[in-house]
Amino acid sequence: MVIYAINGSPRKNFSTAQLLQQFAKGAADCGPDVEVRVINLYDYNFSGCRECFACKLKDGKSYGWCAWPDDITQLLKDVAMADGIAFGSPVFFYDLSAQMKAFLERLMFPFTAFKKDAPRVIAPKQIPTVFIHAMNVPVERTLTSPCKDILGNTHFWTKHVFGHQPQVIYAYNTWQYTDYDKYVADIWDLEDKKNWKETQFPIDCQQAYDAGKQMVEQLRAQK
């Protein structure tokens, strides 16, 4: 069983990465038959869809697959054949990181077929997914913003392509710097952030860990 944990943050040791690590641990703790592959997207040189449309060519050798040659060409094929995928991204302007958006374009666009008759989705398999969204703002800010609607568009298309409603984990009010005194950031209530980091973030990590275990259990139940 192969599960991917894909980090769309440029940092490998802050909130998004920590949550993904907990997801990976939850999955791996289910037994030696579970292989979790952690991918840091910022280690790869790639762009979003280049609109070459090789994935749409009639009788094309790359029909249904991204053919653009760069660092993720093979990775896209490997991820599409995974048993489960967790996508982790910090939130910028209520949306995914640019690297994560580019990766998802390349991963999912080839699997949407522009034809009248079914099937209009040609992904090689259905895959359960998890999204982990780490954001700097307090939860109250998201209640009056389009944040979840914007992120929900990605969840919608992921379900459309991979056939499962994604499980979504939101981590709010995350700790952004190692030393807040070095940065212009007095808009935030630092004591509140410290308290949230000490009391809520461990709960978020546990939720991510549980999501990893639940994904493996779901996959085993399907066999």
Residue locations for each model-derived region?
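Short aromatic-enriched loop/helix-cap "lid" or pocket-rim segments at secondary-structure transitions
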Residues: 48-52, 142-144, 178-183
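N-terminal beta1-alpha1-beta2 submodule of the flavodoxin-like/Rossmannoid cofactor-binding fold
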Residues: 1-116, 187-223
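Beta-strand-loop-alpha "switch" segments that mediate conformational coupling across diverse proteins
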Residues: 167-177
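Short, catalytically relevant binding-site loops at active-site mouths
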Residues: 92-94, 136-138, 175
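Cofactor-binding loop segments of dinucleotide-utilizing enzymes, especially the Rossmann-like FAD-
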Residues: 8, 41, 132-134, 171
